[in-house]
Regions:
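Regulatory alphaC helix of protein kinase catalytic domains
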Residues: 96-101
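Intrinsically disordered, low-complexity cytosolic regulatory tails
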Residues: 1-38, 77-80, 297-308, 315-387
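Short beta-strand micro-motifs within the conserved protein kinase catalytic domain, predominantly
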Residues: 113-124, 132
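Conserved catalytic-loop aspartate of Hanks-type protein kinases
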Residues: 242
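Glycine-rich ATP phosphate-binding loop
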Residues: 66-87
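Catalytic-loop of the protein kinase fold
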Residues: 170, 175-188
Length: 387
């Protein structure tokens, strides 16, 4: 078999030259095929089996798919992650289409790059760039060597990267509401650069949804502990639903506690989110901090960071900031943290001005959102509740 000429790695037809430079030309899709069939590399199942040593190294699993590490051998060698969807599930098929039908979302450094796909019979696969440092969830909750524990500055940088990725999704045409923002869907590359992943539940919506009062009515789905409570009550999905989920992520990154942990409920009589927010209201933010972190946090930066998490996790969507505002505030906090570490002068009063004392908010319609408010049969509290 004679290999066909490799495509020009700098051609505008190939948005990811570092991957496309070594691929042989794929079979031309039918003209009636979906647009994404002409945007991404089409692999054969034989190629994926060869790349993964017959799917021998599983690196992740979710309700409707498994993820395997693979190696594409060619003119430019590349380690990849291959997602294998459950071939007996209609939901898996829908999730595959959700990943493939949002092609423009890949054009941002903080969004995971889709390389290609494979369809063979009822089998569906997607191929992504490989993230050596795994997920933020894994870094926060696995029993890591203390030497590799994420520093406060590194956590800030990761949060900024993730926020930029979400902001990008919220600013396109159409807009994308991710609907599953959580630490396990924020991946980390070799340089600890954060990338948003897993668009199985995402919704494409018109740009008019950028208006604060606009929404999409949809079946409630997401992960318990990260779902917007306003979305739970009303069934109305907005851009601010992602903002709420990111607020939970900010608190989790700071504390290394999962939102569904029962230890706080048993000790304090309140759930983790209520405890986080109460600590901010009572100016006890230090109690939230991951005790494994060294004392390296500028106090004013800590207060400002906690205030952003507090505002994002407001039960009322209209009171939450936009992701653009979140990015700006986090970048400012990182700047002052760097000044603090370098012993350079900065203005704590200026930083404190973005973190006024929070005010308590009344629960939505008198509802308190305990973990028992949603029941999911055959799943534990960490599993996905999908539509």
């Amino acid at each position: 078999m004679v290999a066909s000429k490799s495509p020009d790695p700098y051609s505008a037809k190939h948005p990811f030259p570092n991957f496309f430079s070594f691929w042989r030309k794929a079979k031309k899709p039918n003209e009636d095929s979906p647009p994404w069939t002409r945007l991404y590399r089409m692999f054969t199942l034989k190629e994926l089996r060869l790349a993964t040593d017959n799917f021998g190294l599983k690196i992740g699993q979710d309700g409707h798919y498994s993820v395997y590490k693979g190696f594409i051998n060619g003119g430019f060698n590349e380690t990849v992650a291959i997602k294998m969807y459950d071939n007996n599930s209609l939901i898996s098929h829908r999730h595959f289409l959700s990943e493939m039908e949002l092609p423009w979302k890949r054009d941002h450094p903080n969004v995971l790059s889709l390389i290609g796909y494979c369809i063979q019979g009822s089998h569906r696969y997607t191929v992504f760039e490989y993230m050596p440092h795994g997920t933020v969830h894994g870094q926060l909750h696995s029993k890591n060597d203390p030497k590799t524990l994420l520093s406060w500055k590194k956590r800030l940088e990761i949060c900024i990267g993730a926020a930029r990725g979400i902001q990008f999704l919220h600013s396109g045409n159409p807009l994308i509401i991710h609907r599953a923002i959580k630490p396990s869907n924020i991946l980390l590359d070799n340089n600890w650069f954060a990338k948003i992943s897993d668009f199985n539940l995402s919704k494409m919506v018109p740009t008019r949804l950028s208006d604060s009062d606009s929404h999409v009515s949809t079946v409630i789905c997401g992960t318990l502990g990260y779902i917007d409570p306003e979305y739970i009550v009303s069934g109305l999905l907005t851009l601010k639903s992602d903002v709420y989920s990111f607020g939970v992520v900010l608190f989790e990154v700071l504390s290394a506690r999962k939102p569904m942990e029962r230890s706080i409920l048993e000790e304090q009589g309140i759930n983790v989110m209520q405890w986080w927010r109460q600590c901010v209201e009572d100016d006890r933010v230090g109690e939230i901090m991951d005790p494994r972190m060294k004392v390296e946090v500028a106090p004013d930066c800590l207060k400002a960071y906690a205030d952003i998490a507090y505002k994002c996790s407001n039960e009322r969507g209209s009171e939450r900031p936009s992701m653009a505002d979140v990015v700006k505030r986090l970048e400012l906090i990182l700047l002052f943290q760097e000044c603090f570490e370098a012993d350079l002068p900065f203005s704590p009063s200026w930083l404190a001005s973005i973190a006024p004392s929070p005010k308590k908010n009344e629960p939505l319609s008198g509802v308190e959102f305990q973990d028992s408010d949603i029941s999911v049969s055959d799943y534990d509290s960490e599993e996905l509740l999908r539509d």
